[in-house]
Every structure is written in structure tokens, then in C-alpha cells.
Amino acid sequence: MSHGKQFTLFSLKPGPNGWHVAFILEELGLTYENVFPNLDVTAHQGPEDLVKYNPNGRIPALIDHGNNDFVIWESGAINQYIVDRYDKERKISLAPGTEEYYTQLQWLYFQASGQGPYFGQLVWFAAYHPEKPQSVLDRYTNEIKRVFGVLEGVLSKQEWLVGNKPTVADISFCSWNEIITTTVLQNFNFEKEFPVTAKWHKKILARPAIKKVWDERAKLLAQG
């Protein structure tokens, strides 16, 4: 490790997915170096320096130098790998093999399949697509609100998604929720429309490790 860190994390400064991996690493006190490849979000193929680690050509991808330079990509799989291997005290995760572990996994799958793609599609059509078809914008906006409704229904009955404590499942939602509610959705009041979910989100965002990483992102974006 020439940089002296245990992990190399390929990420994207404005995008959410690499940052919620960084959240997990920071929560567990694991050292890592962020690498930001020259990724054109409108391109169909990633740059060579990323494709050699992730054949999908997208971020995030993680190299674990403490485990024979093992490479893993897809944020849900990365987060699961990190907590399974390194969260031995179960600070932010549940023990493998337990029922709660599979509930945690359920929420990670929901984040990856139910939150990320729909939130990302709204960003694409709102910010990058040459046309702005209102029917498409409405579809993804409504789907985002549906996802928030799922979270609201569950969190109205319990403080955290699983295990009566904040876990990787809760944290994995944070970066997309923050980006979509502060910079993308129009005429949207998070606290008014989904008060329980908004409160839950703010508690996660205020955690010292999460705040540290998100502040780092803000500084990088400010630098251009």
C-alpha cells in the first residue's frame, strides 16, 4: 500500500453511491483513500482505470489491500462485505445467520433496487437528459415519494430499520436521501410530507462519522 491506507475506494465526487461506502468505512474506523476516476456520467463505458477493477465501468469499487487486494464492486455488496468482515463487534450491523441479519440484508436490497435506481433516474432526467418529459419526471418523483412512504410506514413503528439500533441498512439510504431532498425534488418539504423519515434521516446525517465524510464531500465539490 503505497498510500498506507487499508482500502482504495473508487468514487465520484457529486454522486451518492461511493459516499455511503465511505460512511461505513469511517464508522468502523477503517482507513481508505478516495480515488475519483475521470467518469463521464453520460457515457456508456467507464474509463480503463476503472473498468479493470469493475467490468461495469461504474463506481463504487473497493480494493481491500489487507485482504490480498481483493476487489469488490456494487455498493450494496461492498457494504455487506465490509461489515461482515470487519464489524466484529457489530457496531453497525447484525450477526450473520440471525433473522435480523436477513432483515438487514432485505433493506440493503431494497436500497439498491428500490431507492437507488429510481432516485438516480430522476437525477438523470432532471439534470442530464436533453429533453425534460414531464410524464417521466412525474413517474420518478412519484416513485421516490412511494419509497419514502415505505420508510415512513416502518419508521412510524420503530426507531431504526432493524435491530433496534442504527445499522448499515439505515446508513445506506442517507446519501441518496440527502441529495434528492436538497437539490433535486421541486416543491418538496421533507419534514412536512414524511416527518418520521426526515427525523430518522437527520439523526443519521448528524452522526460524527457521517458528518465528517459528508463535509469532506462538500469541500471537494467547492474546489471544483
List each model region and its residues.
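GST-like domain detector, emphasizing the conserved glutathione-binding G-site
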Residues: 2-135
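Positions that flank functional sites
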Residues: 39-41, 166, 219
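Phosphate-coordinating loops and pocket residues in cytosolic domains that bind phosphorylated ligands
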Residues: 52, 206, 215
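Residue-level recognition of oxygen-bearing side chains
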Residues: 77, 196, 209
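Active-site-flanking alpha-helical
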Residues: 83, 176-177, 214
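GST-like fold's C-terminal all-alpha helical module
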Residues: 107-202, 206
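C-terminal helix/juxtamembrane-tail motif
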Residues: 210-224
